[in-house]
């Protein structure tokens, strides 16, 4: 069994406290987490009885006007302006009067956007020096996985990680989260966000959420708009489907009646709405994800799927995955709500605290340099058998 007590609580008590800061994209999150030191852990074993207690989970999102994305420099400015306020709120909500009682400060090292990541690491270094608390550098993707495992209690699932910057099918083996399949170009969240910009729909609370709401309003669900479907073995491509549906949307707005996918050849009557496009886009993208996830489940002989990442909040994706799992013996789908699917600080605290308890801490600030490219399978998962 894994010994999770290589480092004892700094307070000498029966629990560990971790503060996590996430800021790899347009969401800035600060969370505080407590791990109890149960009797079985004192003997060196790890089980799901080690229930993490979430003391605070604060988040603020940098939102741009409809039709616009977010630039790294502007996002970084947002994070710098808000990080102190969020940390203070998190400490108050957690009931921590003296931050020196924290065992560890965890921050996102990557992957993500360079400037926002740098804003977060500067804040983490500053707090570490002010309060004399050690640092742990966390892989953003590992944070999503470990938070999902903790909340859902999924034992050893195939993980579908779907977000604005990542699309991966992952399974655990020999102390690594192995990537079985992934996008060959853009991530699914990026595909949805860019189509939302084409439609000029609001970015509040998020473009993907607003596309989901439009898709629910589709009245022609028995008639999909034909779109590219690109699955290559265990990998998939979404740039072609985005280019095609962007072209359709522009023809719809221009009322290009020569596009017979959208308008009746004889009468010129509009056949397709924006809601139809959103619905068809979701159905095609999610079908591709379900296909490669099922293939991974068959390969590793698993009957569980854990969906993590911001797009994992999508109810339709969860429904389609559940439908696939029902056709497999004892198939199960695990997912969390928007508190934990969307980027947050507490997921960084969870993964970081597991690393800390295994003795993985930053020994020098040179180890805190952030990186925009940080693969999920680069991390040695010492806290699992």
UniProtKB/Swiss-Prot annotation:
Enzyme Commission (EC) number: 2.3.1.234
UniProt-annotated binding residues for substrate: 161-165, 193, 208, 212, 314
Assigned GO CC terms: chromatin; cytoplasm; EKC/KEOPS complex; nucleus
Location(s) in or outside the cell: Cytoplasm; Nucleus
Catalysed reactions, semicolon-separated: L-threonylcarbamoyladenylate + adenosine(37) in tRNA = N(6)-L-threonylcarbamoyladenosine(37) in tRNA + AMP + H(+)
Keywords: Activator, Acyltransferase, Cytoplasm, Metal-binding, Nucleus, Transcription, Transcription regulation, Transferase, tRNA processing
Cofactor note as given: Binds 1 divalent metal cation per subunit.
Subunit structure, interactors included: Component of the EKC/KEOPS complex composed of at least BUD32, CGI121, GON7, KAE1 and PCC1; the whole complex dimerizes.
UniProt name for this protein: tRNA N6-adenosine threonylcarbamoyltransferase
Organism: Eremothecium gossypii (strain ATCC 10895 / CBS 109.51 / FGSC 9923 / NRRL Y-1056) (Yeast)
């Amino acid at each position: 069994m894994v010994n999770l007590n290589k480092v004892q609580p700094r307070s000498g008590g029966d629990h560990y406290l971790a503060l996590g800061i996430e800021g790899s994209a347009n969401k800035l999150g600060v969370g505080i987490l407590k791990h109890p030191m149960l009797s079985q852990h004192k003997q060196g074993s790890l089980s799901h009885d080690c229930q993490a207690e979430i003391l605070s989970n604060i988040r603020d999102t940098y939102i741009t006007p409809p039709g616009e994305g977010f630039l790294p420099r502007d996002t970084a400015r947002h994070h710098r302006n808000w990080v102190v306020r969020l940390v203070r709120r998190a400490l108050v909500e957690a009931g921590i009067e003296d931050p020196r009682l924290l065992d560890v400060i965890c921050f996102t090292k990557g992957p993500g956007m360079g400037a926002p990541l740098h804003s977060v690491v500067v804040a983490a270094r500053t707090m570490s020096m002010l309060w004399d608390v050690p640092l742990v550098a966390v892989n953003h993707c590992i944070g999503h996985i470990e938070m999902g495992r903790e909340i859902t209690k999924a034992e050893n699932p195939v993980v579908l990680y779907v977000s604005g910057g990542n699309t991966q099918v992952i399974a655990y083996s020999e102390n690594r989260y192995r990537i079985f399949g992934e996008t060959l170009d853009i991530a699914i969240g990026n595909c949805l966000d860019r189509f939302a910009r084409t439609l000029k729909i609001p970015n509040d609370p998020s473009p993907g959420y607003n596309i989901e709401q439009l898709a629910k309003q589709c009245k022609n669900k028995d008639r999909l708009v034909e779109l590219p479907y690109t699955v290559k073995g265990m990998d998939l491509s979404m740039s072609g489907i985005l280019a095609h549906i962007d072209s359709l949307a522009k023809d719809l707005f221009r009322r290009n009646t020569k596009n017979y996918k959208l308008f009746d050849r004889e009468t010129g009557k509009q056949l397709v709405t924006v809601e139809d496009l959103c619905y068809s886009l979701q159905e095609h993208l999610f079908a591709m994800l379900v296909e490669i996830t099922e293939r991974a489940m068959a390969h590793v002989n698993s009957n569980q799927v854990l969906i993590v990442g911001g797009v994992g909040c999508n109810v339709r994706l969860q429904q389609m995955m559940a439908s696939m799992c029902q056709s497999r013996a004892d198939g199960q789908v695990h997912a969390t709500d928007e508190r934990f699917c969307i980027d947050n600080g507490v997921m960084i605290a969870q993964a970081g605290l597991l690393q800390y308890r295994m003795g993985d801490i930053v020994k020098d600030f040179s180890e805190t340099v952030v990186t925009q490219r940080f693969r999920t399978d680069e991390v040695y998962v010492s806290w699992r058998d």
